[in-house]
């Protein structure tokens, strides 16, 4: 066979090899102010499970991070990203971090992975009662939401206390599919050395490069993009509260419990549970 048939393959392998050895710092410039503006309401995987986008968000002085779970993606005109949509009226734009399955443990890992950038920052945490079940975060949600890159960053934070790192490690060891158990066991016992790593430097380098590249790919529209605002940007808090009460009353007329009409229909069709007392336990591991 002629060599020319293999030239495209050889070139592809060479380019791939070059990509692997390039440092992630060469790609960090891809995350610009425009990237952050696009990502702040995207709830994309690269933002939720990455490290570079959130790091640049904290370094910027243009955003106000809001941590939560599924409520951040709700098609509601009182979503903070809709209420505070006008950049001319609000110096800091909401940056939404969280989606369904993002319990307090997931949020705590995200925050701790940026610990050295948190000093002097303001943020909001939306806490949901249904996080605090008997078992806490499920193995399924752990596998889907936990980020190896963020865990690696967490354990490398210079100013995060060893005691807090131990608590993280002990909690993580309770999940059956957590990776690098040997490392976590060392951290839990306080026997970690500077040479130990949760994720290898090579693998972390690849994670960061992929995040930087994907951060500029076209984003799918979220439900937030189709919401028609019902508030004005210069409304006072009193006016916002009155409009919220009116909106809530208008959209909960099908039942005496004042449950949103759409959700009530799901309950009637047995697509949502009525009794959810089990979802809150003061002895939950999430506390």
Named regions from a protein language model:
Residues 4-25:
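Hydrophobic membrane-insertion alpha-helices, especially the h-region
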Residues 29-91, 110:
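Membrane/wall-proximal cationic-aromatic binding patches
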Residues 33, 155-287:
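Secreted/periplasmic serine-hydrolase-like ester/acetyl group-modifying domain
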Residues 37-40, 92-100, 276-280:
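Short, basic, glycine/proline-bearing loop/turn elements
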Residues 45-46, 104, 285:
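A conditional alpha-helix N-cap/helix-loop micro-motif detector
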Residues 67-69, 125-130, 261-272:
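Short loop/turn segments at strand-loop or loop-helix junctions that form parts
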Residues 72-163:
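Membrane-embedded segments
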């Amino acid at each position: 066979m002629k060599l020319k048939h293999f030239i495209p393959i050889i070139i592809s392998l060479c380019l791939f090899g070059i990509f692997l050895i390039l440092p992630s710092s060469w790609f960090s410039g891809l995350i610009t102010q425009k990237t952050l503006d696009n990502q702040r309401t995207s709830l994309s995987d690269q933002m939720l499970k990455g490290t570079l986008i959130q790091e640049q968000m904290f370094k910027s002085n243009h955003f106000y991070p809001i941590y939560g779970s599924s409520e951040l993606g709700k098609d509601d005109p009182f979503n903070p990203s809709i209420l505070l949509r006008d950049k001319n009226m609000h110096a800091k734009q909401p940056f939404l971090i969280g989606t369904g399955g993002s319990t307090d443990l997931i949020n705590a890992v995200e925050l701790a992975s940026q610990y050295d950038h948190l000093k002097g920052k303001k943020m909001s945490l939306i806490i949901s009662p249904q996080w605090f079940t008997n078992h806490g975060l499920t193995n399924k949600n752990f596998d889907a939401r936990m980020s190896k890159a963020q865990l690696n960053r967490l354990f490398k934070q210079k100013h995060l206390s060893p005691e807090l790192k131990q608590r993280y490690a002990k909690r993580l060891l309770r999940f059956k599919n957590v990776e690098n158990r040997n490392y976590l066991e060392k951290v839990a016992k306080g026997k970690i050395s500077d040479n130990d790593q949760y994720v290898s430097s090579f693998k972390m380098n690849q994670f960061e490069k992929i995040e930087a590249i994907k951060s500029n790919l076209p984003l799918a529209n979220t439900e937030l993009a189709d919401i028609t605002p019902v508030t004005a940007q210069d409304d006072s808090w009193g006016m916002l509260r009155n409009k919220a009460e009116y909106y809530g009353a208008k959209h909960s007329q099908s039942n005496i419990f004042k449950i949103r009409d759409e959700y009530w229909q799901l309950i009637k069709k047995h697509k949502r549970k009525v009794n959810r007392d089990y979802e809150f336990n003061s002895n939950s591991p999430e506390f």
